[in-house]
């Protein structure tokens, strides 16, 4: 187990979309690990946050200061960070009861039969590979709502989806889409060994985040434009 508490690292780059005394909303670049873990002890978002916002050091888990939900290192987009213990508890409960909303921009292989669908399939650790998640009978309940928002014929038959997380399991969108045979483009783990089409990472971006502010209880919404690497790739795709 990892026991070393993360230290501040001002060299970690990320954009702050919004900040006040209770919450910070960041736009995470692709390739940035959210918090320290085996193999990634330094240079994580948590280290960068501690350099910019030292007050989060004692919020929540010392290994994951202020962090109340996660994004895979290969994904980009919005993440909310708590600055106080009260804010952390308030936000954690919203992710637990699904009142916080997360919308992702995704590109998948093929065209789903139904333009709108809900993937309701329990997820757990893969029996063959503990680093992978899989649809398993006794897994945790998991639901992903998807809507097809565009289809393309080049560089392959692919579809752009808007995915809403009704639960937030590890790798949920990636595993769910792969389970209906429409894996994410560029996904090295769940991509069913399809070609990368020039993508260096999974085409998955956390585009919208909505929650009730811990103090005012007002509903707040944040948007993030598609990450520049994905946008550059998309500019070359053809309908």
Q: Predicted segment positions?
A:
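RNA pseudouridine synthases
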Residues: 1-239
């Amino acid at each position: 187990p990892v026991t070393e508490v993360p230290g501040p690292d001002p060299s970690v780059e990320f954009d702050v979309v919004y900040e006040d005394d209770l919450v910070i909303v960041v736009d995470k670049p692709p390739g940035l690990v959210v918090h320290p873990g085996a193999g990634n002890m330094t240079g994580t978002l948590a280290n960068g946050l501690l350099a910019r916002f030292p007050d989060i050091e004692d919020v929540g888990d010392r290994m994951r200061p202020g962090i109340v939900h996660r994004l895979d290192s290969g994904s980009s987009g919005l993440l909310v960070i708590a600055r106080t213990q009260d804010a952390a508890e308030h936000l954690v409960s919203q992710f637990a009861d699904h009142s916080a909303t997360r919308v992702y921009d995704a590109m998948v292989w093929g065209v789903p039969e139904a333009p709108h669908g809900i993937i309701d399939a329990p997820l757990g650790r893969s029996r063959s590979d503990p680093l992978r998640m899989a649809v398993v009978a006794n897994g945790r309940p998991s639901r992903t709502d998807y809507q097809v928002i565009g289809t393309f014929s080049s560089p392959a038959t692919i579809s752009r989806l808007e995915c809403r997380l009704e639960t937030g399991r590890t790798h949920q969108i990636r595993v769910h889409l792969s389970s209906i045979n429409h894996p994410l483009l560029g996904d090295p783990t769940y991509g069913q060994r399809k070609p990368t089409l020039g993508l260096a990472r999974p085409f998955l971006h956390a585009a919208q985040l909505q929650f009730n502010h811990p103090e005012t209880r007002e509903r707040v919404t944040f948007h993030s434009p598609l990450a520049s690497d994905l946008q550059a790739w998309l500019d070359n795709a053809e309908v």
